[in-house]
């Protein structure tokens, strides 16, 4: 692993919390995200659980809907992989904000889902705000605790 990989790993290790914004890209994770993971994972500190217990918010968007019971159920190969990486490999505490149907209003074939997409958007925005407030609150507590040490 080169100096660039160590610098990326240092950023992860030094962070109080992480916010990862990763869209579904052609039913998987984008190549640059996979490359970033591969470079950071080469650092033994990351592979050794240096992020155990660290809060991570994964914000992800999907153009369609790949949930149970939909015609393309199981086509999301990004979110499950990211869960494995963040929870099982890194040992971090994962919170997911996922918004489906971002192509409604763009792709005419999805127009029938306009109302559902609006509901999904509202729910995702509310969940994102909740997680953001939680991270901010927890960060303030940690800074106060550290200042008192």
Task: Please annotate each region the language model reported.
Residues 1-2, 121:
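A conditional alpha-helix N-cap/helix-loop micro-motif detector
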Residues 72-73, 82-149:
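Glycine-rich phosphate/pyrophosphate-binding loop and the adjoining helix
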């Amino acid at each position: 692993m080169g100096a660039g990989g160590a610098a990326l790993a240092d950023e992860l290790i030094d962070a109080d919390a992480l916010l990862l914004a990763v869209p579904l890209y052609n039913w998987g994770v984008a190549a640059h995200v996979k490359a970033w993971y591969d470079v950071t994972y080469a650092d033994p500190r990351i592979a050794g659980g240096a992020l155990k217990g660290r809060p991570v918010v994964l914000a992800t968007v999907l153009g369609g809907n790949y949930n149970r019971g939909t015609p393309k159920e199981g086509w999301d190969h990004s979110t499950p992989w990211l869960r494995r990486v963040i929870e099982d490999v890194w040992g971090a505490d994962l919170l997911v904000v996922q918004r489906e149907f971002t192509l409604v209003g763009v792709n005419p074939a999805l127009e029938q889902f306009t109302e559902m997409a609006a509901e999904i958007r509202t729910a995702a925005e509310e969940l994102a705000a909740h997680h953001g407030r939680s991270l901010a609150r927890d960060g303030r507590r940690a800074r106060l605790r550290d200042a008192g040490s």
